[in-house]
């Protein structure tokens, strides 16, 4: 059973302490202010949402999420393979079973925050991931283009090409219409705190020294928000991909596609 939950951050002082800004070069911010708490560090959010699930240390992540803010209130849509705890000191949780009735040819409006990367091999044949928008920018600059419009257009086209590639759409079981909105391109550079690293060591100890994937103190990734329309070609592929997540990065608010039906006369 899968669950789609709306998780709202409580306006409490403890919640503010949990989500203090921890991006590199943070701007000063008072924890005692009356402003709605801001979740400035996706790593902290990701760790906090883990607390909604009763799982032993070292377990696979059972959820995807996407952060929104409306009227000064921060909330998350969380898609999970386990039912979240409804009683949490930092969150108000509304959970319901996720069992959509998709059909071939169905048209859906979608929103997705993704990590658009491609794998390239170096001279030694070693493959590594690269941000497709940054690759497009560097390519334009290497060709002598320095005007913002041309570079922005090349980056936009790269973002569209990434999500509408035939191989990707076939893998996801959809056709994505190329008339897309792209926004909020962000390069994230996050630091794990000393406390986070100590917790990782404690988790490894609790697993009787069973190896846990090593995690660097610095986390770097990019994200891009997509909004548009798609048509389902393979129900099982699409449904399974929704549960797994879209794109390489499926943590830190990436990978969750939110959809709603489109009327037949909508584009």
Annotate each predicted stretch with a short phrase:
Residues 1-267:
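RNA-interacting cores
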